[in-house]
Amino acid sequence: MDKLFTGKFLFTGLVFAGLALYPFIGSSYGLDLVSKIMIYAILAMSLELLVGSTGLVCFGQAAFFGIGAYIAVLFSPESESANLLWLLPASILAAAVYALFVGALSLRTKGVYFIMVTLAFAQMAYYVVHDTKLGGGTDGIYLYFKPILGSVLDLNNPKTLYFFTWVFLVWTFVFLAMLLRSHFGRVLAGIRINEQRMRASGFSTYPYKLAAFTTSGGIAGLAGFLFAVKDGFVNPEMMSWHLSGALLIMIILGGLGHLRGAIIGAFAFVFLQEFFKSSAIFGEFAKHWQLGLGFTIIACVALLPKGLVGLPEVLRKRLDGSRPRDAQVVLK
């Protein structure tokens, strides 16, 4: 078990190291793409805390993401750069407060009712920015000046913004990994496995679920802030149910119950999107990239029930099964 645990974190450490080295060898397009994927990975980990770790299938994660992004733009002056030290916490806090409100009501329901309530609250937030001038309507709004931290941190530099995002990706992973290995995380695992048994053991599960929901919303707000700063633009589609659905696909594709699965799923999902959108590879079929992406995801889920994190185990079993029985006896 210790070797397995060490191996998992060694793999994750190598991935983080590779991402840290990428700006020195990657193109400007690649830098922008990987920055976007890292933001989606942070967002996917926030949902993994709910779905994979607590057993709460939330269909409104995009709302918290969008709130973090809109706060970053709406609270930024049009004539100068905002101070990063207060704008970033404001985005996280706004998303967390809305998550606290949504969670306080939705967590009193279960199953499909919980899914529908979270979706309803997400759509409410979507239409607030879609149908009013507050969020620029369907046109969205621009971030004219990216936030700064004096002369120390200039996020207008693509490499600086990349490393800024990378730091928060690593921080999110470490924070959630420590959280899930704490007493709080063990209670969440117990709720996922059998909530009634946890209640019978004397645990009041509602506060734990609400704390997890609020934490998840705050991290989603962090991802939204990073996305707004990277693109310099936000629109209502950031809050649409399509993004919430895509996030669920990411964590299922990567492997539920694993933080590294959320990261792997985010990378796999976006790379598959870019692959099937390539007209240089697929020609006219690239216009129908959703078909290729859909069939590939279905195949991955069918062949890899544990997600992409389970791929090494599947390959190991197939290799062991393909060896002659006599050879296996000799190896033993």
Predicted regions: what they are:
Residues 1-332:
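Transmembrane alpha-helices and adjacent helix-loop boundaries
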